[in-house]
C-alpha cells in the first residue's frame, strides 16, 4: 500500500459522471483540497461506464458518479454514498396554467439523458403519474439545459438545491418538486486508494448541509 504522506505533491485524478450537477460536485471536491497540502487535482468528465473502466485500469483515483457499484461484483472497488437531493421542474414566464404535475403536459420537456440514472428515474416517474409528456431534448449539462429551455419555452429539470441561489432570479421559476425522485452522488474508489489523504477527506466529510434544499 502506498504511503501518500511521503509524497511532496499529491496527484489526485477524479472522474466525474457527466450527468451530475457540476456545482454540487465542485462542493464535494472542496474537501479534497487543503491549504497546507500540495495537491494536484485533475478532473475528467465522461459516462459512468467509461469512468468505471478507467478506474479499474488504475487510470483514475476516484469517481464521483450518480450510481453505486456492487463491491461483490467489482473486486477491489468500493463505493460510498455522498448524498442525494430531490429534483425540480423549472421554466421561464409565463407559467403553465395547470397545477403541478399536470402542467408538465402543457410544454415540451428537457430532461437528463436516459443513459443517466436520473433520466431513467424521471421517465419511470412520468409513467407512474400517467403523464403524457413530450420530450424536446435530453441534456446532461444543467446550464445548457437552462439556456435551451429559455430559448424554446420548455420546462427543464435541475436539482431542487438550485432554488437556493443558482436560479434565484425573476426569469426562471420553479413550478414543482419531485422529492421521491432523487439524484444520487456516490464516491467510488479502489482499495489501493484508501490511504490517499484526499480520498479520506471526501469519505469522512459530512455533506448533509450541502444536500439540504431551501424551503419553498
Which role does the model predict for each range below?
Residues 1-9:
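Alpha-helical "hinge/linker" immediately C-terminal to small N-terminal DNA-binding modules
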Residues 5-6, 76-114:
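Flexible hinge/capping segments at coil-to-helix
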Residues 9-71:
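Central regulatory/effector-binding core of bacterial HTH transcription factors
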Residues 11-15, 63, 110, 156, ...:
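Short, well-ordered beta-strand segments
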Residues 24, 173-216:
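A late-sequence structural motif
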Residues 47-51, 56-59, 66, 115, ...:
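Hydrophobic hinge/microswitch elements
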Residues 73-80, 85, 144-194:
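Beta-alpha-beta core module
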Residues 107-129, 195-197, 203, 213-214:
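Secondary-structure junction motif
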Amino acid at each position: 500500500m502506498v504511503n501518500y504522506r511521503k509524497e511532496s505533491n499529491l496527484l489526485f485524478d477524479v472522474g466525474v459522471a457527466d450527468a451530475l450537477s457540476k456545482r454540487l460536485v465542485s462542493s464535494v471536491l472542496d474537501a479534497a483540497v487543503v491549504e497546507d497540502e500540495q495537491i494536484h487535482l485533475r478532473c475528467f468528465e465522461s459516462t459512468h461506464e467509461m469512468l468505471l473502466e478507467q478506474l479499474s485500469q488504475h487510470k483514475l483515483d476516484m469517481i464521483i458518479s450518480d450510481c453505486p457499484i456492487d463491491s461483490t461484483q467489482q473486486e477491489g472497488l468500493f463505493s460510498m454514498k455522498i448524498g442525494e437531493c430531490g429534483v425540480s421542474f423549472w421554466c421561464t414566464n409565463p407559467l403553465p396554467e395547470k397545477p403541478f404535475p399536470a402542467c408538465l403536459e402543457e410544454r415540451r420537456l428537457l430532461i437528463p439523458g436516459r443513459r443517466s440514472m436520473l433520466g431513467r428515474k424521471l421517465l419511470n416517474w412520468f409513467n407512474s403519474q400517467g403523464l403524457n409528456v413530450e420530450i424536446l431534448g435530453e441534456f446532461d449539462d444543467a446550464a445548457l439545459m437552462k439556456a435551451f429551455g429559455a430559448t424554446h419555452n420548455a420546462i427543464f429539470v435541475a436539482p431542487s438545491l438550485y432554488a437556493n441561489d443558482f436560479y434565484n432570479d425573476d426569469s426562471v421559476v420553479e413550478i414543482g418538486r419531485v422529492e421521491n425522485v432523487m439524484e444520487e452522488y456516490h464516491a467510488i474508489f479502489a482499495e489501493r486508494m484508501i490511504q490517499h489523504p484526499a480520498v479520506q477527506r471526501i469519505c469522512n466529510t459530512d455533506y448533509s448541509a450541502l444536500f439540504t434544499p431551501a424551503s419553498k
